Amino acid sequence: MDSKREKQAAAQNAVDILHEISTILNCHLDRRTLSICISMIENGVSPEALASVVKELRKQGQEATAQIAQAGSAASSRRR
């Protein structure tokens, strides 16, 4: 059982260190997302491909947020 706890502690420490690096580099990845990315890479996903997907999802998220804000602004001006 100690071995399992040691492995969990080591994994948590690794995530903490990678989260610190992520924060310094302004990657905006929380610990949970970072853990998922690490797991995907450990299971064979290409880090470069994963980075591309994360960038694309962020871009789409920003575009969707902008469209929602624009639609809300247009609806607000029509009510006046």
UniProtKB/Swiss-Prot annotation:
Localization: Cytoplasm, Cytoskeleton, Microtubule organizing center, Spindle pole body
Keywords associated with the record: Cytoplasm, Cytoskeleton
Source organism superkingdom: Eukaryota
GO biological process per UniProt: gamma-tubulin complex localization; microtubule nucleation by interphase microtubule organizing center; mitotic spindle assembly
One Pfam family from the record: MOZART1
Gene Ontology cellular component terms for the protein in this record: cytoplasm; gamma-tubulin ring complex; interphase microtubule organizing center; mitotic spindle pole body; spindle
Sequence similarity: Belongs to the MOZART1 family.
Subunit field text: Part of the gamma-tubulin complex.
Function field: Required for gamma-tubulin complex recruitment to the microtubule organizing center (MTOC).
UniProt-recorded name of the protein: Mitotic-spindle organizing protein 1
Source organism: Pyricularia oryzae (strain 70-15 / ATCC MYA-4617 / FGSC 8958)
